[in-house]
């Protein structure tokens, strides 16, 4: 079966629309364009699709209502603009969806909602219930309360996290470019459009680095989002939002935009939460033997395989596991604090008691609490 056929068969979609598409050249929301996308999403919903919308535009809408000509730099002013604009954004969507007798719901998320296991499960339950009721949830980051340190970074990332959260089949990212290219089409008339690539194709990294084609126009963030979504088995489409009838055409399997497909089997719900958790508290550097055991045998991480410890963390918190070159291999929940881990790193499990004066676990991270990335 072709990869586009998988998209055609998918029925649970997350659709992300960026602010470059939603705003009318800095003059507030482009209601005419919003009406076009709402009509397309309504068509999917009427056909039985479960649709979740991740929408930018709150800050831009707020700037217009406040009479600000330039985007502010101060965080508190951005948050004020988001607070003012969010109501306008939701009201605009609600009015458009009402034309098709479709109800909407507003969902604001922050890191704590997705890093805390109980809140993560509550958010998942709410979103699933809404979509089963035929309601289209409109998701955005809770800009009014987040700080720079705990931001998702961009709504591409948020879209991928929502895709993981609801176990979506497809993440559709609408952008102001019609697809992804192997070089900048604005500078190279011979630039080739990327039709299909694995989300984990290393060639995408090569294009993204050192000012490569994907490093411009926010495309590298879309690659990262596709990789995050792929961990739960979702395929990602990056496609031009201004293409005529773009959403139904992509859903029908038509070759539009760039498909970044998943080669992964969907992982278990708990491990999907771990993979999408964006707030690690520390990092462990592993030796080659530990990396091999994790990758090839799927075993737990023992203290003997740890060479270095970075950060401050307590028991049960999330840490990254890296190889000696600094590449992330896995992430998981630790059984020992950073102080304890520093004392037992490089030691066999049989020595934990003598090094700490007690031993609660043989494993530093149990395989049930560890996910490869």
Swiss-Prot record:
Known pathway: Amino-acid biosynthesis; L-proline biosynthesis; L-glutamate 5-semialdehyde from L-glutamate: step 1/2
Catalytic reaction annotation: L-glutamate + ATP = L-glutamyl 5-phosphate + ADP
Domain (PUA) ranges: 281-359
NCBIfam families: proB
PANTHER family: GLUTAMATE 5-KINASE, ISOPENTENYL PHOSPHATE KINASE
GO-annotated molecular function: ATP binding; glutamate 5-kinase activity; RNA binding
GO process terms (BP): L-proline biosynthetic process
GO cellular component, one term: cytosol
Record's keyword annotation contains Iron: no
Source species of the chain: Saccharophagus degradans (strain 2-40 / ATCC 43961 / DSM 17024)
Residues holding substrate: 56, 143, 155
Location within or outside the cell: Cytoplasm
Main localisation: cytoplasm
Pfam families assigned: AA_kinase, PUA
Protein name per the record: Glutamate 5-kinase
Binding site for ATP: 16, 175-176
Keywords: Amino-acid biosynthesis, ATP-binding, Cytoplasm, Kinase, Nucleotide-binding, Proline biosynthesis, Transferase
Function: Catalyzes the transfer of a phosphate group to glutamate to form L-glutamate 5-phosphate.
Family of the protein in this entry: Belongs to the glutamate 5-kinase family.
HAMAP family recorded: ProB
This enzyme's EC code(s): 2.7.2.11
CDD domains: AAK_G5K_ProB, PUA_G5K
